[in-house]
């Protein structure tokens, strides 16, 4: 399956009591699709997966699948640092009708490369769906090596990688050595254009909550051969891309959505709301986008 070029790692909306708000989920899905999203990643890092209970994740998967109704791929974040739990959640997500699976590198346990290979292989074995690997060493401590990614890419239903280690040399090595059917996605909004320039398929984006149409414009300009226009857009969008990460994700993107008039609630502990200074900075960045 082709997941598309601009995928959104969707926030999880909460109500005033901190419960998952499925009505807001529906509205958010429609908002994102109307603003250029070609695929939705549900219950990933941006969706606060570590603080969601399994029943909440399953309710999210089911709701998003129903609302999307096959318009774009729905990718379920089923990864954790417990291989058995991840595989079982993958089976349940598959039964709910999602289109793909995303699994993060196991955090805290600090597994070896061999351990990570076995972890992802077990998750892939639990489903017939395409699986996206997710490498984010800043959060998980371990870094999935290019060699291990290449080895995993030959498992038939491991078809893509969300790469968030920020290392373009590493990305080149992965793209060079994996099959043409295996796609690399930037896991950092600010590296979208550099990653595209070395052969990445697209981006799994947080900023697309706020600048979805502009992200699509940049993607289309690059793919259409207008690299100069794509570069101009990249430079224009870079401040908001960076600004959304001045506090632990998804703190700032939820605040930015609220500033723009779409309240998706707060974040769950141990995350805390942004400071007044952070909110003011986000307000400034959003206002700058309007006038630029």
Swiss-Prot record:
Localization per record: Cytoplasm
Record's signal peptide: none
One Pfam match: DHDPS
Reactions listed under catalytic activity: L-aspartate 4-semialdehyde + pyruvate = (2S,4S)-4-hydroxy-2,3,4,5-tetrahydrodipicolinate + H2O + H(+)
E.C. no: 4.3.3.7
Annotated positions binding pyruvate: 46, 204
Alphabetical list of NCBIfam families matching this protein: dapA
Protein known as: 4-hydroxy-tetrahydrodipicolinate synthase 2
């Amino acid at each position: 399956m082709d997941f598309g070029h601009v995928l959104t790692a969707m926030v999880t909306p909460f109500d005033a009591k901190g419960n998952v708000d499925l009505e807001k989920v529906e509205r958010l899905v429609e908002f994102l699709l109307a603003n250029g999203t070609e695929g939705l990643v549900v219950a990933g890092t941006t969706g606060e997966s570590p603080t969601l209970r399994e029943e909440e994740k399953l309710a999210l998967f089911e709701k998003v699948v129903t609302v999307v109704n096959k318009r774009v791929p729905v990718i379920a974040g089923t990864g954790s640092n417990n291989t058995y739990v991840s595989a079982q959640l993958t089976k349940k997500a598959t039964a709910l009708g999602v289109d793909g699976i995303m699994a993060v590198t196991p955090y805290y346990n600090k597994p070896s490369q061999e351990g990570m290979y076995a972890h992802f292989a077990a998750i892939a074995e639990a489903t017939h769906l395409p699986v996206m690997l997710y490498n984010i060493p800043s959060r998980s401590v371990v870094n999935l090596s290019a060699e291990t990614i290449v080895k995993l890419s030959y498992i038939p239903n491991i078809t893509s990688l969300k790469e968030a280690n920020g290392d373009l040399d590493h990305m080149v090595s992965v793209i060079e050595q994996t099959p043409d059917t295996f796609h690399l996605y930037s896991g950092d909004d600010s590296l979208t254009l550099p990653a595209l320039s070395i052969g990445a398929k697209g981006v799994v984006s947080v900023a697309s909550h706020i600048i979805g149409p502009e992200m699509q414009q940049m993607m289309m300009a690059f793919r259409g051969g207008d690299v100069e226009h794509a570069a101009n857009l990249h430079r224009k969008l870079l401040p908001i891309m960076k600004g959304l990460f001045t506090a632990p994700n998804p703190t700032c993107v939820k605040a930015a959505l609220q500033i723009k008039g779409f309240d998706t609630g707060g974040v769950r502990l141990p995350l805390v709301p942004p400071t007044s200074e952070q909110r003011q900075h986000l307000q400034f960045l959003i206002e700058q986008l309007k006038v630029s």
